[in-house]
């Protein structure tokens, strides 16, 4: 069973323009509205791959109702805690050349009572055989230690956790030893306070240090270059697949979804890595944050050629 947790979901509003003119008039070509937030994107992608998950987190107000309706249409199992505040809207301005400008709202204030309800709900799912995906930002009122707290509690019940967060949410959670993490190059540069762009050799060194700290699997996203997949037993580099890019929004979430889906099904590590890269490539070839079809992923996975490191 896979449970995704989206602490700060959003309606993703993607606006297509030819070229965005700062301070000038922009004519809109097309608008797409999707249920968004990193965990929600993961759940939608798992569904597209043929799997099931339970999407949890916080929803509130008219925007929250709209997201719930969108998830119902997509046949995604949703069990969110209802909050008093209004779920946010994240606006993404997509230009014809692939440039993306994002305007993300802060999200509602979460009360201690609402947070406690969610934690109680998560513990109902916590058991051996359950994968939790903790991803994305948190709203005001939620402590930066929340992911680490959840990891420790569900680990006691035998569950596993894929953590996809950055900044303080990432650093505060490492001591809890999540089973899988997925930082990108920029996040690791921030994590160690680097004053230069890290080389692949340096990234591998940091990844191995994280493994020594007790992390089970470290996936380092390299953007258009692919990703590194590291465990103590094996290390792979999966170069990215060349596809026509429509939107990079949700590409990382697609990788998280596919890798977790594969692990939940008991697939081999290399198979999970290949599935992650193929699904991520499929995601960037779709509009907005819509996941790729399973047929598209099956087509792309044939092109993924892992390199053993």
Per-region residue spans from a language model:
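Glycine-rich phosphate/adenosyl-contacting loop at the front of the ribokinase-like
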Residues: 1-56, 64-66
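Residues that scaffold the ATP/ADP-binding catalytic core of kinase and kinase-like folds
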Residues: 14, 103, 173, 191-192, ...
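Short glycine/proline- and charge-enriched loop/turn segments
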Residues: 18-27, 184, 189, 236-240
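Conserved N-terminal subdomain of the carbohydrate kinase-like
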Residues: 24, 48-129, 299-309
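Short, conserved phosphate/pyrophosphate- and ester-handling motifs at nucleotide-, phospho-/glycolipid
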Residues: 46, 184, 252
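Conserved beta-alpha-beta core of the PfkB/ribokinase-like small-molecule kinase fold
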Residues: 131-201
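Conserved phosphate-binding/catalytic region of the ribokinase-like
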Residues: 153, 171, 200-309
């Amino acid at each position: 069973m896979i449970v995704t947790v989206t602490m700060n979901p959003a309606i993703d509003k993607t606006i297509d323009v030819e070229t965005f003119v700062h301070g000038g008039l922009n004519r809109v070509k097309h608008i797409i509205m999707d249920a968004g937030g990193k965990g929600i994107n993961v759940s939608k992608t798992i569904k597209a791959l043929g799997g099931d998950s339970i999407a949890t987190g916080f929803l509130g107000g008219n925007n929250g109702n709209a997201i719930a309706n969108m998830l119902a249409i997509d046949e995604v199992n949703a069990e969110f805690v209802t909050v008093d505040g209004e779920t946010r809207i994240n606006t993404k301005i997509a230009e014809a050349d692939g440039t993306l400008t994002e305007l993300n709202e802060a999200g509602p204030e979460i009360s201690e009572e609402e947070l406690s309800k969610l934690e109680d709900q998560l513990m109902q799912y916590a058991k051996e055989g359950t994968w939790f995906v903790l991803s994305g930002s948190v709203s005001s009122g939620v402590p930066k230690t929340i992911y680490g707290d959840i990891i420790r509690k569900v680990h006691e019940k035998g569950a596993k956790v894929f953590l996809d967060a950055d900044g303080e949410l990432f650093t505060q959670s490492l001591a809890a030893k999540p089973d899988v993490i997925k930082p990108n190059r920029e996040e690791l540069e921030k994590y160690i306070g680097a004053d230069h762009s890290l080389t692949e050799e340096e990234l591998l060194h940091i990844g191995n240090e994280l493994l020594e700290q007790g992390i089970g699997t470290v996936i380092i996203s390299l953007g258009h270059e692919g990703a590194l997949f590291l465990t103590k037993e094996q290390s792979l580099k999966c170069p990215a697949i060349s596809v026509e890019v429509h939107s990079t929004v949700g590409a990382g979430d697609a990788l998280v979804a596919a890798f977790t889906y594969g692990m939940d099904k008991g697939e081999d590590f290399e198979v999970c890595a290949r599935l992650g890269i193929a699904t991520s490539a499929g995601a960037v070839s779709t509009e907005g944050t819509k996941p790729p079809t399973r047929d598209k992923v099956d087509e792309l996975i044939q092109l993924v050629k892992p390199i053993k490191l």
